[in-house]
A protein has these predicted regions:
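Short hydrophobic core segments
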Residues: 3-6, 266-276
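FAD-binding beta-loop-beta segment adjacent to the flavin cofactor pocket
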Residues: 297-363
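A conserved FAD-binding loop/helix module that cradles the flavin
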Residues: 281-287, 352-388
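Conserved N-terminal glycine-rich FAD pyrophosphate-binding loop of Rossmann-like flavoproteins
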Residues: 27-54, 145-160
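Dinucleotide-binding Rossmann-like beta1-alpha1 core, especially the glycine-rich loop
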Residues: 42-115, 121-133
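Conserved beta-strand-loop-beta-strand element in the redox core of flavoprotein oxidoreductases
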Residues: 232, 247-266, 271
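N-terminal Rossmann-like FAD-binding beta1-loop-alpha1 element of flavoenzymes
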Residues: 1-28, 377
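Helical element adjacent to the flavin cofactor pocket in flavoenzyme catalytic cores
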Residues: 124-131, 165-248
Length: 388
């Protein structure tokens, strides 16, 4: 029983985990993480300001989150501070983010250090002005901490600054800087700088005996890097990994052949497509070279798979077939994807299953991606078992 997973983002990792848990060691193909490596650390099933009820975290998703080791999911919603100055609810969060629900009605110190991309007084004022802070009487204020050791640390990327604190010397220096600041809040809120490999937020919490955590990360920041490390650890245990770009997926007999650059082709009974949407490059914009040619979408690799937009199949691009972005809006970029049914089965392709942002018309959210990856893996296993 051979099953392949195409994609190394959240959906692909969830699918690989579920396959391994049920006794099938998958082959996982991916070159990059896609949009999963860009996420900020807040975990949702749908856009957070449209949520009307608390979504349930089922047993399968909770099991995957525990195995991944990078997320915190609970029976109630969390509340996080964003890098942009918002206080918002989240169904879960990456480990290291400060859960503000634990700090309701208390004094939260926003670390003030001289980085060019960080304005602690402005952020503290924005957090304090949020409806949640006013309702819970939570006080945010800036607190100067002299944690920079070199001038270039003012302007290096958030990822690089976080990585500096993986060393014992820098993590100890940061703790010392906080201790000598003369400030004794009920919680400390940092930017997304508390290490990549080490759980520095937990270490500081234990040393200071108050909650310590971060805001969300920017694109390509610490949260995405931590996910990638956790993914690599899980896949090393559960899957055969091929770090290569897939160029073709072709039907062969009752199964499929996967062709990737600088790899021998592999044949599989079923394949989970977790190749991402437009943001990840799994779905590409395509331009016709005809004189009056239009613009449309295609998969980034050759496969017998139809793309769908608003429940309509997206045909090849030509002067007669084109996506009108003026009429449809840029939201089209978040809607287009592989045409599949509720059971994740790719239309007209027995043995193919889609997950995550690769699916048409599904929320582009981390927990939705994980849930759909688990579902696609389960459906793939059901298909293979029926076929054999």
């Amino acid at each position: 029983m051979k099953v392949a997973v195409l994609g190394g983002g959240i959906a692909g990792v969830a699918a690989a985990f579920e396959l391994a848990r049920q006794g099938v060691r998958p082959s996982v193909y991916f070159e990059h993480s896609g949009s999963s490596g860009l996420y900020g650390g807040a975990l949702d099933f749908e856009v957070w300001d449209r949520v009307t009820a608390l979504a349930e975290v089922d047993e399968d998703l909770a099991r995957f989150a525990e195995a991944l080791g990078a997320w915190q999911l609970g029976s109630v919603a969390l509340r996080v501070a964003t890098l942009e100055g918002n206080v918002r609810p989240a169904r879960g969060a990456a480990r290291g983010l400060l859960d503000l629900e634990r700090c309701a009605g208390k004094r939260v110190a926003v670390v003030d250090l001289e980085r060019d991309d960080w304005d602690a007084p402005l952020l503290a004022a924005s957090f304090a002005a949020s409806s949640w802070a006013r309702q819970t009487h939570t006080h945010f204020y800036e607190a100067r901490v002299r944690a920079l050791q070199n001038g270039f640390e003012r302007r290096i990327s958030g990822y690089d600054f976080a990585a500096l604190h993986d060393t014992p010397e820098r993590s100890q220096a940061l703790l010392s800087a906080v201790q000598v600041s003369g400030v004794t809040p009920d919680a400390w809120l940092f930017g997304p700088w508390l290490g990549i490999e080490r759980a520095l937020a937990d270490e500081l919490s234990q040393a200071l005996r108050v909650p310590v955590g971060e805001t969300t990360s920017g694109l390509g920041g610490a949260a995405g890097a931590r996910f990638e490390r956790a993914r690599d650890r899980l896949l090393e245990r559960d899957a055969d990994v091929h770090r290569a770009r897939v160029t073709q997926l072709a039907r062969v007999g009752s199964g499929y052949r996967v062709t990737a650059l600088e790899r021998e082709p592999g044949e599989f009974s079923a394949v989970v497509l977790a190749t991402g949407g437009v943001a990840a490059g799994g779905v590409a914009l395509e331009r016709s070279f005809e004189r009056r040619g239009g613009t449309g979408f295609s998969l980034s690799f050759d496969a017998p798979v139809a793309l769908e937009l608003n429940r309509e199949v997206v045909e090849g691009v030509s002067s007669l077939s084109s996506v009108d972005f003026v009429a449809r809006g840029l939201g089209t970029l978040l809607e287009v994807g592989i045409a599949a049914g509720a059971d994740a089965a790719v239309r007209d392709n027995p043995g193919l299953f889609a997950a995550g942002d690769a699916l048409a018309g599904r929320p582009r959210m981390a927990l939705e991606a994980a849930r759909s990856g688990l579902n696609a893996a389960q459906r793939a296993l059901d298909y293979v078992r029926r076929s054999t």
